[in-house]
Amino acid sequence: MKPILVHMHIYYPHLYKDLKQCMLNINTHELDLYVTMVEEHSEVISDIKATFPDAKIEILENRGFDIAPFIHVLNKVNLDNYDLLVKLHTKRDINTIPFLVNGFDVGGGKWRNYLLNFCKTEENWKKSLDLLNSDDVTMVSDYHVILKQDDNVDSKYLDKLEKKLKISYSSEREFVGGTMFVAKANIFKVLQNKLKPEDFSSSIRGSGDDLPYACERILGFINSGKIASFNGKKGVLERYITLIFKLIYKHKITDKKETIKILGIPVYKKKKN
């Protein structure tokens, strides 16, 4: 088996310990680890060098959240050298609305925990790898965060990416909300050298730049195969809850504003700068 390519983006240094535990599970295989940060966190860097001595560490400009650093890494590697790719980052706690994703409560650290779940234990990591032995599975994560296209990103950004990458997307295609997964490396070739970090604005939430969120979806849409869940799929009750949730809860983002409606009544509005 070829080495596994791992990109780990560290914005919140206090959350590095969560990623480290996942990396220790992944490290049972040969890997090439690329670590990106926007500041030089000396204690974290020292720990990475001690634990993963071959890691390549770079300090990058703070653009495009975790997506622009991922693009940076994609543009500098030869994907033919890898069978699999793992993407990890320090997902912050969610302490304000919206706190529901895919019909599930993702408040506090729950979203991060769902995203890291595929490699959080040795058993979960093995299940994820086993799924990727199937020809039709090209990406694996946790079912709580495997989503379908929605109105949470301005469609003009998706339209531009569709033309630039010469791909098509639809409301039926799935993506991993929060972009942490293990996937077959070759599906990302379509992205190589088509985007660059300079295409992204500074990482300021609510700035009106939806390019990172459009790319989040594109990472799933470029996938010609299936996004599988290592922990199965929703039960009947969970599916009904999700359906009801979608009927009563609407979250829409445009280049001008963000709106949340419950039963058609606006409960949250925020204009973008």
Q: Which residue ranges define each predicted feature?
A:
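ER/Golgi luminal nucleotide-sugar-dependent glycosyltransferases, focusing on the catalytic module
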Residues: M1-I248, T254-D255, P266
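Short, Lys/Arg-enriched, disordered terminal segments
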Residues: M1-K2, K271-N273
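Short linear proline/tyrosine/threonine-rich motifs used for host-factor recruitment
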Residues: K257-K261, Y268-K270
